[in-house]
């Protein structure tokens, strides 16, 4: 048993029971974005959160413990993602990454955008030409220090 096994079980139960991530998030009391990342093995749950997830997905006590182990974050199965939706994000960074970097440095100076002190919001945006995906990423700016 490992964290990947627990993630696979969560996905299997989600599909078989028709569970929605937003409903899981409401029960956990956190955002749908963070909760989904946690259920997919990318975040660490505390004991209380793991018990709520365990109840929703029928996890054993051992499986709930795995949800509390710090995961290997950013662990995709291949170096370049092959899933079309995930690949589009790879493409966005490939095409616009240098632009994003330049504009952040111009606005804030030399540093990085945190993915730790971070939030994300994903919403549907109605558009007569076809609905759009609106993604807002908000990360604390962390300047490099001199020493």
Curated annotation (Swiss-Prot):
One Pfam family per UniProt: CYNS_N
Coiled-coil annotated residue ranges, if any: none
Superkingdom of the source species: Bacteria
Alphabetical UniProt keywords: Lyase
Catalytic residues of the enzyme: 88, 91, 114
EC number(s) stated in the UniProt entry for this protein: 4.2.1.104
Catalytic reactions on record: cyanate + hydrogencarbonate + 3 H(+) = NH4(+) + 2 CO2
Broadest EC class assigned to this enzyme: lyase
Database matches in PANTHER family: CYANATE HYDRATASE (PTHR34186:SF2)
Official protein name in the record: Cyanate hydratase
Source species of the chain: Variovorax paradoxus (strain S110)
Gene: cynS
